[in-house]
Structure formats: structure tokens, C-alpha cells
Amino acid sequence: MRRLIQLLCIAMLAVWIQPQAADAAKAEPVTEKIIFIPHDSRPISSTQTADVVTKAGYEVVVPPTELLGSREDLGHPDQLWTWVHENIAQPGVKAAVISSDAMVYGSLVGSRKHNESRAQILARASRFTELHRAHPKVPLYVFGSIMRTPRTGEASGHEEPEYYRRYGADIFRYTLLRDKEEVEGLSRRERKEYEFLMRLIPKEALTDWMGRREKNYAVNEFLINLMRKNGTFHYLALGRDDNAPFSQTHLESRHLAAVGAELGKTRFQTMAGIDEIALLMLTRAVNEQRHEVPFVFVRYNWGRGADTVPAYSDEKIGTSINDA
């Protein structure tokens, strides 16, 4: 009889505990989270961007500031890889918005000034495959940059190698002519100018600048191919900052767009700008989680309107808005 009473008490306790546990679960829902790794520690890139999505009801999980790069600190990519693997497994993570520049070079400025080997940066880029394989249910929204081409040394803002302050305008003009030659050809006068610039710009400076660009182009091409062949990313965007309608940035963008053309704009884009792309990617992640498709209608003022080409862009503002 005593045994029977004990069993009845245990059964009653179990019946009482289950609703309590269910009520506790309802009372403390897991907050939906988005992992966000910005391309540097500037507020416009990190905290201000994250705050927008926080106000939409999400917890935005961002690495400690000391892991993010700045103008003085090029960043800590290997530590960021450790951080993302530790944090992406948190309960409630719905998506990850990640700067490839941060994960490969340490930061946006790091992508412009690094001295890493091609093998090293491609090895870091390949770790996206491992991340996707380990967490296949977390969509990866990855954004990177196509290296910029400032018009002058002064316009570079100390974010290019030191020689760019002296030869920046010449390097810009040299790449303008390279790009134009591919698109529409050069006049005899432009051909002579091109040959003159090749003699004027120190060979070691041009080799360093173009060599770094070649490595960064290889990384961007590698990321596109990860998307094409393996579907590693849910969405991939490459931004273009500080360039012109004819420039090395425009040339590389044309080539990369061709590599990823078959993916379509719902999976891959190159677009004008870079600092705003993180917010675009976070917004895309939120809209897709909520299955919402917002529509935005733009009206331009009198004048050139949509045909205006901003001073630091390679395309009409109307094209930039449509791509966004």
C-alpha cells in the first residue's frame, strides 16, 4: 500500500511539474538573434547599424570592439573566426551577417594595406565552407569590398599605402585608361599618356598596389565560386567605394559581375558603396525571416535626377537605388 501511495505521489508531482515547465518556457522565450560581424569598429559600421535592427526586436550579437579593426589596428581575423564559431551556435540565432573583409584581412582598411600572402587569405576565405557545413540551418549573408581607387592621394584619407599620397592621382589615371581601353578603346593621345604613366609611376609602387588588388580580386572570385558551386552563402554582396566610371574598381567589378552573372541578383550583386551594405544585409535577413517584401517608390527632383553620377561612384544614382 505504501508503495502504491509513493507511485501516486510521484505521478501527481510529474503532472504538476510539466505545466509549470511549460509556463516557464512561455514566460521566457528565446530572443531571436542575428550574428553581425562589421568590417571595422567605426560606429557607422558597427553600433549604429546594429541599433537599427535591435529596435526591430532582434538581439544583434557583435564581437568585442578590440577584435574589430580600425584605421590604426588592421584587425584580428583569426580571432574573429574563433569568435563566430563560439557564438553562432547560441540558441535563437536566425542568421549571420558577416564582413568577408573582417574575416579575411581583419578589417576594411586591412583589405587595402595588408601584406598577407595569397595562400593565407584564400585559406581564411575557405573557412566559410567549414562554417556553413557546421551550421547549415543558419543562413550566411556575406558582404565584402572591391578595392577602391581614390582619385588623389589626398582623397585616400591615409587609408592607402604611403606612396599613394604622392602618386595617387597618377595611379588613378593609369587605371582609368586601362579600364577605358577594355570598354571602348583609347585614342592615340590617351595611348601616349598611358605609356608615359607607366614610366612615371615607380615600378615597385605599382607592383605593390596592383599585386594587393590581384590577391583581393582572387578572394572575391573565390567567394563567388563558393556560392556558385556549393551554395555556401544565402546572399553575397560586393561593394564599390571611392571610384569612378572608368577606374580599376570599375574594371574589377565588371569582371566579377561576369563571374557571378548566372547567380542572379537575388543571390549575388556588386553595388556602389560599402558602409551602407551592412545595414542592407541585416535588413534583407530580417525581411526574409519575416517573409516580408517591402516596396519603395522613389521620386527624383528636377534636373538630371536618376541620371546623376555621384562624385565617388562609377554609376548613376538611379542604378544604385534600384540595386539596393
Give the ranges of each region predicted by the language model.
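Positively charged n-region of N-terminal signal peptides that target proteins for export
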Residues: 1-4
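Sec/Tat signal peptide C-region and signal peptidase I cleavage site
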Residues: 20-23
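Bacterial N-terminal signal peptides
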Residues: 7-16
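An N-terminal assembly and electron-transfer interface module characteristic of large anaerobic redox
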Residues: 25-324
